[in-house]
Amino acid sequence: MVDKMNLEEWMRPSIRTLKAYESKSIPDCVRLDANENPLPWPPGMIEQLLGSAIAFNRYPDGGAQELKEALSRYTGVPAEGILTGNGSDELIQLLMTTFGGEKGAVVIHPPTFSMYEAAARVTGTEVLEVPLLLTETSRDFRLDVEGILKAAAQPQVHMIVLCNPNNPTGTLFPREEILRIVAESGKIVIVDEAYGEFSGESVVDQIPYCPNLLVMKTFSKLFAMAALRLGYLLGQPSIIGALNRARQPFNVNSFSQKAGVIALNYGEEYAEQGRILIAELARIAEALTAFASVKVFATRANFLLFQPEDPDRVYQELIGKGFLIRTMGNLPLVGKALRLSTGLPEENERLIKALGEILK
């Protein structure tokens, strides 16, 4: 019998230094911290999903063929160029497992989505950071294209991850800059378009011409399916085939696959929801901009980054008024800042009132 195990000693060094991901949950608070779509599913969609003949006693279709065919119609990418995952987080880790590891490196542009670095650390992939540039006068973030290309020239670099629009800043980077990095880097370029439906911009149309381009998308944001964990990668069949070698079998459950197929039939309804959320976010941004002490950063997503004089106080007082937003800690180039996404219109009305009382 083992009385005591030295777990820290047995852990891989790259895991030993990591902190477990924690999501905050406060009862009776309006959740504006996770960039979700708060609007209900389109009428009839839930009934259609629950009425589907799903064999819960059987393993799901390991190839998610019906879903990939629906995604092919939606994106214009052939089904053999599509890989589905248990949320984008699984796909990010799959990318690091396949093309990273202890002899590989990835280039990222902080501040950006934290899971890129987390997945890299778990897999022992080296992380090279090329921070964004900040134009203080316009409060716009920019890619350091030359810096990214210089970092990517190092032989151990296999991947570059570009988040567009970027989380947490909301920045939409110019298409020509992204395509220049794809063309000149000679490395795998992953463009995370989780919020692409809100910006209306995409580089998916360039996949036929760029064998090193992967575009990652999700059903968690506009399609309001965060609870079902469904993401997908788009690329040329050769690179998707390589990733399939390391993919876990049956990684997307039958219920989520069917939900994705059905959701894609409601494109017009979801597009209207996107317009509503963007208009609501603009209303919140306008209210924040009225306060000279608050920096509001430009956004092309369904969330915004802002910086009051005392972020910690604003965060805590909003909780006291029934609103949970995201405290971003000390962001590179920015310092302490807060991020919020939109609630329902009536919730946003209350939020604007609460912000006015706190910031006055």
Curated annotation (Swiss-Prot):
**EC number, as in UniProt:** 2.6.1.9
| Record keyword Ribonucleoprotein present | no
Write the gene name. Answer: hisC
Which Gene Ontology BP terms does the record give? L-histidine biosynthetic process
Please tell me whether the keyword Transferase is annotated for this protein.
yes
Subunit: Homodimer.
Residues with the modification N6-(pyridoxal phosphate)lysine, per the entry, are 221
Can you say what this protein is called? Answer: Histidinol-phosphate aminotransferase
Concerning Pfam families, the annotation shows: Aminotran_1_2
Q: Which SUPFAM superfamilies match?
A: PLP-dependent transferases
Instruction: Identify the pathway.
Output: Amino-acid biosynthesis; L-histidine biosynthesis; L-histidine from 5-phospho-alpha-D-ribose 1-diphosphate: step 7/9
One Gene Ontology molecular-function label = pyridoxal phosphate binding
**Keywords of this entry:** Amino-acid biosynthesis, Aminotransferase, Histidine biosynthesis, Pyridoxal phosphate, Transferase
- What's the cofactor? pyridoxal 5'-phosphate
Question: What family does this belong to?
Answer: Belongs to the class-II pyridoxal-phosphate-dependent aminotransferase family. Histidinol-phosphate aminotransferase subfamily.
Show the catalytic activity. Answer: L-histidinol phosphate + 2-oxoglutarate = 3-(imidazol-4-yl)-2-oxopropyl phosphate + L-glutamate
Give the organism the record lists: Desulfitobacterium hafniense (strain DSM 10664 / DCB-2)
